[in-house]
Amino acid sequence: MIKVVGVRFRTAGKIYYFDPKDLELPLGSHVIVETARGVEYGTVMVPPKGVTDDEVVQPLKPVLRASTPEDDKTEQKNREKERQAYKTCQEKIQKHKLNMKLVEAEYTFDNNKLLFYFTADGRIDFRELVKDLASVFRTRIELRQIGVRDETKILGGVGICGRELCCHTFLSEFAPVSIKMAKEQNLSLN
């Protein structure tokens, strides 16, 4: 048996599992963890529990620490910087006359990288935009093209049932939608 803790980084995002070591991490607490993208700030969604070896992808990255008030302030500052980065990127997209829709800006916790998520109908040559953004923000810039379902998950909205969209509130992964399913729900087939 291995002890793991489930951590989520964004609203309705996927839950990732980490080694809690000997930390006491209640549900809803904030933690600092080591990820493939670097050090990240997340929320405990599954408190520490034991699982069998084959249920977890090895090796488990560790939880570095429970977040401190300083970490919480850093995370809040990053959210404010993301709003400003979003506005700046929108202006640069218009300046370069690119046919893309910016969805979200995201700083890594340690400010080593700034990610921009966007949607577009086809492939976009955004090399000049990346150079422009790198000169403004003086950090590594990454642009990621996402699909319309991912866009909806990030932005949210209200479904035809009148409730908040499932993908924005609790679905962490998307199952394929068949033509039959769309017809049963009277959705357009495009």
Task: Explain the meaning of each model-derived region.
Residues 1-189:
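Acidic-enriched and Gly/Ser
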